[in-house]
Amino acid sequence: VGGAAVHAGTGKVCAAPSALTRAGFPLPHLARALHDRSPATILVLNSATAAKKARPGSEKDVLLRSFPSYIEETLRARYPDGGVVVTTHNEPRATAEAILPGMPAVLEKTKPALVIWQTGTYDTILGADTSAFSDAVSTGISYAREAGADVIVVSPQYSPHTAFAFDVAPYNNALRWAARSSGVPFFDRYSVMRFWEDEGIFDFDSARPSPSLFDDVHRCIGRLLVGVIVDGVEMRTLGSR
């Protein structure tokens, strides 16, 4: 099975099956912003707004970077004249439906060309109705499009410590359906991370995880998402030159 493989920068190879790393749909708004060299703002919605600090006394007692910073760094290198700026908006412990009322204002303030929407975690924890969840995601995608932005939907993270307690599968399926029916890319982070665990690329089940695990995983997620973004930007649509 073919797949994407990028280096995390620490010797880790962030391999993933190609089915999980393709855009599947174009990103015309971002492509236009990059081409016109206008500000190509990418909004990461429901992401941590600050880097995480390693535990005191650990071998890496430094600020650890989350994946939006790697997206910005890598896209700026690929499109040096594109004016790429990555910004985040965090609404912790919010379901997809709870985010909707404030979403238009966030879009108006940031004016993104692309929204990377991480959602489904708290819907899963709370056992939200999957149909209502899917409808909320579809509505959010519509809000972004009305504001002139493309969308990439990102599923929850995988953790073996919580997988036995919460069934993510119905929400992943709902996200996939909402994304495909709306014609936007779906990045199945849950399945990517599960693949890494199964293949021994990362050990998420360790009682004492390596201090570098957070940074390595976010670097890999960021670079795989860049692959999805580039795929969507460079995808030729019917009738394009």
Identify the function of each model-found stretch.
Residues 3-88, 105-111:
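Serine-esterase "nucleophile elbow" of acetyl-processing enzymes
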Residues 36, 61-66, 93, 97, ...:
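Soluble non-cytosolic domains of exported or imported proteins
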